[in-house]
Curated annotation (Swiss-Prot):
Entry-linked PANTHER family: METHYLTRANSFERASE (PTHR43464), UBIQUINONE BIOSYNTHESIS O-METHYLTRANSFERASE, MITOCHONDRIAL (PTHR43464:SF19)
InterPro entries documented for this protein: SAM-dependent_MTases_sf (IPR029063), UbiG_MeTrfase (IPR010233)
Main enzyme class: transferase
Substrates-to-products reaction catalysed: a 3-demethylubiquinol + S-adenosyl-L-methionine = a ubiquinol + S-adenosyl-L-homocysteine + H(+); a 3-(all-trans-polyprenyl)benzene-1,2-diol + S-adenosyl-L-methionine = a 2-methoxy-6-(all-trans-polyprenyl)phenol + S-adenosyl-L-homocysteine + H(+)
Single GO MF descriptor: polyprenyldihydroxybenzoate methyltransferase activity
Task of the protein: O-methyltransferase that catalyzes the 2 O-methylation steps in the ubiquinone biosynthetic pathway.
Protein name, per record: Ubiquinone biosynthesis O-methyltransferase
Organism: Bartonella tribocorum (strain CIP 105476 / IBS 506)
Domain of life (superkingdom): Bacteria
């Protein structure tokens, strides 16, 4: 059992995202960057799940009978495409306002998604297991990364996959994700990111390995200002994604 007197929730982060929850499904709003690079990360997730679970990548519903957990799901930007691909999806977020928005949008699109207002540590203590866990752009917002990874790892089935996307702790990431995105371009509200919470890939790999998770792939996701697009890259200096497998 995980000690729930300890928490992964950072109240200031929770308050911040609660204030802007109504913006989740506005592609030109405060979550514009997520909408922009969502297709890139979705393509990667689909490709790797099909490869590791031996699914037909051209099938309309390749994730049929797979159970997916999206932690820190926000308004459901990842949950909805996972459900459309056939997965049984559970989306959790500590912010009730985010879950409210996600539920309404799913209902409007006739999608069956199990949304819950809870934390990783509380859910882990319920004993539920998943084939795939998505920790996308969330570890840089939690209060205790080690506790968070420990809790999420406990919910992963043997040979299950965990996708973890976050920001590297480099001056380049500080300049792009904070100074550029928040203060100059104003893509994101000021205060969205805290540089001290950014993680170097080796640090994140260490947290994963301590919890019986082996990194089997890694990519960077970079922005091209010439065509206003996001693409996979070997450059992990700013945004990066690790794919880990449970032993």
């Amino acid at each position: 059992m995980i000690d729930e007197t300890r928490t992964t929730v950072d109240q200031s982060e929770l308050d911040h995202f609660s204030r802007i929850a109504t913006e989740w499904w506005n592609p030109q709003g405060k979550f514009r960057p997520l909408h922009q690079f969502n297709p890139t990360r979705l393509a990667y997730i689909r490709e790797k799940i099909c490869l590791e679970f031996n699914r037909d990548p051209v099938s309309l519903m390749p994730f049929d009978n797979l159970k997916i957990l999206d932690i820190g799901c926000g308004g459901g930007l990842l949950c909805e495409p996972m459900a459309r691909l056939g997965a049984t999806v559970v989306g959790v977020d500590a912010a009730q306002t985010n879950i409210d928005v996600a539920k309404i949008h799913a209902a409007q699109n006739n999608l069956s998604i199990d949304y819950r207002t809870t934390t990783a540590e509380a859910l882990a203590n319920e004993g539920e297991k998943f084939d795939i866990i998505l920790n996308m752009e969330v570890v840089e917002h939690v209060a205790d990364v080690n506790l968070f990874i420990n809790a999420t790892a406990k919910m992963l089935k043997p040979q299950g996959l965990m996708f973890v996307a976050t920001l590297n702790r480099t001056w380049k990431a500080w300049g792009f994700a904070i100074i550029g995105a928040e203060y100059i371009l104003r893509w994101l509200p000021k205060g969205t990111h805290d540089y001290k919470k950014f993680l170097k890939p080796r640090e994140l790999k260490n947290f994963l390995s301590k919890n019986a998770l082996t990194v089997i792939d890694e990519i960077g996701i970079t922005y091209n200002p010439l065509n206003d697009s996001w693409n996979r890259s070997k450059d992990m200096d700013v945004n990066y994604l690790l794919l880990a497998k449970r032993s």
